[in-house]
Amino acid sequence: MIFSTLEHILTHISFSIVSIVITIHLITLLVDEIVKLYDSSEKGIIVTFFCITGLLVTRWISSGHFPLSDLYESLIFLSWSFSLIHIIPYFKKNVLILSKIIGPSAIFTQGFATSGILTEIHQSVILVPALQSEWLIMHVSMMILGYAALLCGSLLSVALLVITFRKNRQLFYKSNGFLNESFFLGENVLQNTYFFSAKNYYRSQLIQQLDYWSYRVISLGFTFLTIGILSGAVWANEAWGSYWNWDPKETWAFITWIVFAIYLHTRTNRNLRGANSAIVASIGFLIIWICYFGVNLLGIGLHSYGSFPSTFN
């Protein structure tokens, strides 16, 4: 009873903080000058991280098993993983661009998990026989950590593509404008050229930083995903007598692995780095959500215990 009450309190606290942080983020999108307001939202995510940690520990103690047995618990753990990846660059200060892009992922995932949409599966239940194994922690935690890291790295790649596209478009417009105005501005030409060069240099540095960190985060996520798939195969052999069954979840996890293996392969070719590899990662972003949510909508296969409630099927 005590743990249930504590879990209820932590859930409402985290949802309240997330609601406030979402509001702050929307305001900062409109007003960039409010630095203190943005910093408050960052601290709010950190507080949410500790609330989620407390929620997971409380649920673990009350249920007697690691909280990764259904969709709700996996969403909470995914939100926790996003928050963990978010706060590391936040404290490093020199990679704040990561926290700005990753932060909203933690916010919206936690907001969805603690909202009333998944109320039916908030209550902890006894594990089904297939999940009563020590492999639960190893397999599912590695998969969720892998999904979180891959999603974050893919978001960085999406941001890279957006900036690259805008950069190329504005370069075209500005170059034409410069050619037209240079005949009339006279002494202002050098000043305009310097401003254009400085802005272009900043964007180039930003693109390089996004490309660098996207590669590092995706590499980490790919490692987690590989460990998760291999441990899942061993667990499947113990539970069902076969390492691989081409279950919908297994199939899409394999497709996800292939897509990001292609991404890492493109990184070995210097000519394919940057926008080309970012396109592959962006495709992987969609594939992960299909694997994580889309397959759950079907509610079939050996992983059907992680599906949506019956009202959503």
Curated annotation (Swiss-Prot):
This is Cytochrome c biogenesis protein CcsA. One of its GO terms (biological process) is cytochrome complex assembly. The chain crosses the membrane at residues 9-29, 44-64, 71-91, 101-121, 143-163, 217-237, 244-264, 278-298. InterPro entries: Cyt_c_assembly (IPR002541), Cyt_c_biogenesis_CcsA (IPR017562), Cyt_c_biogenesis_CcsA/CcmC (IPR045062). It is a multi-pass membrane protein. One of its GO terms (cellular component) is chloroplast thylakoid membrane. It comes from the Eukaryota. May interact with Ccs1. It comes from Nicotiana tomentosiformis (Tobacco). Its main location: plastid. It is found in: Plastid, Chloroplast thylakoid membrane. Required during biogenesis of c-type cytochromes (cytochrome c6 and cytochrome f) at the step of heme attachment.
